[in-house]
């Protein structure tokens, strides 16, 4: 078994299937949630897992369909991913008691974390959103609750004999994975350890199922502005200035909200890989009880 992180691998049986996550450290719990793409896993939060576990008990989840969690053939939706976070929080509270939890998510998974925090506000003390989706341009995403941008016709096409797996295999060739990571970093200086794990994880049985839902937009929420509006917790949003993910004009909506704060790094979309000490220090300051 190839582990993404240097921590204790734990597994729980949940309503969303078999969930795997890594645990390390002591103290108040902190949850880390990786991105969503064709090759995602908990390996994408490695610098934070290593540094923050010196101060907290850190839980880094493999979301359903990714990493070592269950990869069954099904439709993967925001509801499924959000419920997986609820299941993890329920487990954490059984271990640590019913104290509030700090949580950080990256990219599209910020939408799942925000939804979980909006649905169970008393479970979360702080929410950290790294390069979150739903802020491109000034368009408001205020569809009816639970609606997604999913293209059902495309998902059905991708699930057809041979099509989806063939496309997935093309998108996860080592050269293609490196290409997309360079676009994420906005630089050729990607993290090689993360790259190697991305190549490995896409070769595992069932690795295509969740990414095919991602490719057909099933995991993008059309109501996410309404969800972000509901957040009562302290929210820290951060992003970089390089690569494909630099348009966050939508954050203007929360510029004067007392519970929101913002940091822009001279980095790609994963600033904690490039400025790990600075990012970790600022995260620790943010999540420290006042």
Language model feature labels by segment:
Residues 1-18:
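N-terminal cap/lid segment of alpha/beta-hydrolase-fold proteins
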Residues 267-280:
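Catalytic histidine-centered segment of alpha/beta-hydrolase-like enzymes
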Residues 105, 109-113:
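Gly/Ala-rich beta-loop-alpha elbow adjacent to hydrolase catalytic centers
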Residues 20-68:
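Conserved HGGG/HGGXW glycine-rich cap/lid loop of the alpha/beta-hydrolase fold
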Residues 46, 60-106, 281:
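Active-site loop/oxyanion-hole signature of alpha/beta-hydrolase fold enzymes
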Residues 230-267:
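Conserved loop-alpha-helix segment in the C-terminal half of the alpha/beta-hydrolase fold
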Residues 166-229:
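Conserved alpha/beta-hydrolase catalytic His-Asp/Glu region
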Residues 118, 126-163:
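Flexible "cap/lid" loop of the alpha/beta hydrolase fold
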């Amino acid at each position: 078994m190839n582990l993404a992180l240097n921590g204790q691998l734990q597994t729980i049986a949940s309503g969303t299937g078999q969930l795997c996550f890594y645990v390390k450290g002591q103290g108040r719990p902190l949850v880390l949630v990786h991105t969503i793409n064709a090759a995602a896993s908990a390996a994408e939060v490695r610098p934070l897992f290593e540094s923050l576990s010196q101060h907290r008990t850190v839980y880094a989840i493999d979301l359903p369909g990714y990493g070592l969690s269950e990869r069954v053939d099904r439709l993967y939706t925001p509801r499924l991913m959000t419920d997986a976070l609820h299941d993890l929080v329920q487990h954490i509270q059984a271990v640590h008691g019913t104290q509030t939890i700090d949580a950080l998510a990256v990219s599209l998974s910020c939408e799942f974390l925000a939804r979980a925090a909006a649905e169970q506000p008393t479970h979360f003390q702080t929410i950290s959103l790294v390069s979150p989706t739903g802020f491109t341009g000034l368009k408001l995403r205020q569809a009816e609750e639970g609606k997604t941008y999913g293209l059902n016709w495309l998902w059905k096409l991708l699930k057809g004999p041979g099509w989806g797996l063939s496309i997935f295999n093309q998108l996860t060739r080592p050269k293609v994975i490196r290409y997309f990571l360079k676009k994420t970093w906005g630089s050729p200086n990607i993290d090689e350890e993360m790259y190697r794990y991305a190549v490995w994880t896409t070769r595992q049985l069932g690795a295509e199922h969740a990414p095919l839902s991602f490719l057909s937009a099933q995991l993008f929420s059309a109501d996410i502005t309404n969800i972000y509006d509901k957040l009562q917790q302290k929210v820290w949003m951060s992003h970089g200035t390089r690569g494909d993910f630099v348009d966050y004009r939508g954050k203007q909506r929360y510029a004067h909200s007392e519970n929101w704060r913002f940091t822009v790094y001279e980095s790609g979309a994963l600033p904690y890989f490039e400025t790990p000490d600075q990012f970790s220090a600022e995260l620790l300051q943010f999540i420290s009880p006042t």
